[in-house]
Amino acid sequence: GSSIYNIVFIVFASSMPQPKFAVGIANFIVLIPTFFTVFVGMQADKTRQKARWLIHLGYLQAFLFILVALLTKSASYLAFATVCFLNIFSDIISDYRSGLQMPILQKNVEEKDLMEAYSFTQLLTFLGNFAGQALGVWLLSISQQNFAMVALSNALCFLLSSSTLYLVRQKLTHDTPAATEQKLPFRKQMKDLYQNVQMIFEQEKIENFLLVLLQVLLLNAPAGSIMGLYNLYLLDHPFWGLNLSQSLLVIESCTVIGIISASAFSNDY
């Protein structure tokens, strides 16, 4: 559910008046939820009834995409702006739900199997994202650019997902977070997070933590901006006579293949 509409959202933006402007806005909209990732993760850790929120928020996302389906029938910028807001809200909810899942996984998987379980979860996430985007492009093609139908399909996926979780809700157990008497300031929480990450690096005997962190940030910055440039470039220069959505799927396919291939090697270079 969280991936079917990713490419379709860019294609919807390209159908607006002044498509390059709309696609540029869409590129920025996709990035906004990443600014809240740390805060959302902290809130997920503090949530006491994780299974309940995991299920209920899935139903909320289904409702959001029903609204998106209604809005995409209009080509106005007011409708586009509302879809952008709903997309941001849904992506933040998806990040929050991912944070809720981790403690449940930790509780129900033996410690010796946790790393293997994390790796398998990551693999399924990448494959699910790729399959979801491919499904979105296929639905868009057979429906002749019917954005509402794709959004409704997305809503159906969230509905089925939460309904499945509801059926096994008794098994979604986790350790209850310790209640804190005094709420820590956000700045203090960020400082503690930084110190914890630094401690992990030191345990792994990785020297010069700040330099490694800077390298990661510098590598991620251009890598994260490449897709936005492709979105604009492919408006006028699609690959091999394909349309925009199919060309974007080719790029995503190469990215997923690269990530999975890199994950197969555990050596550092």
Regions found by a protein language model. Name each.
Residues 151, 155-182:
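Helix-loop junctions on the cytosolic side of multi-pass membrane transporters
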Residues 17-27, 119, 242-252:
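Small-residue hotspots at the loop-to-helix junctions and early N-terminal turns
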Residues 171-213:
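Juxtamembrane intracellular "pre-TM" segments in multi-pass secondary transporters
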Residues 10-16, 69-74, 129-153, 236-237:
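Transmembrane alpha-helix termini and helix-breaking/packing motifs in multi-pass membrane transporters
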Residues 7-8, 147-149, 198-263:
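A single, central transmembrane helix in multi-pass transporters
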Residues 12-16, 46-47, 104-108, 142, ...:
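Helix-to-coil boundary motifs at intracellular loop junctions of multi-pass secondary transporters
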Residues 1-6, 27-44, 51-61, 82-141, ...:
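Substrate-agnostic recognition of the 12-TM MFS/MFS-like secondary transporter fold
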Residues 59-77:
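C-terminal ends and interior cores of transmembrane alpha-helices
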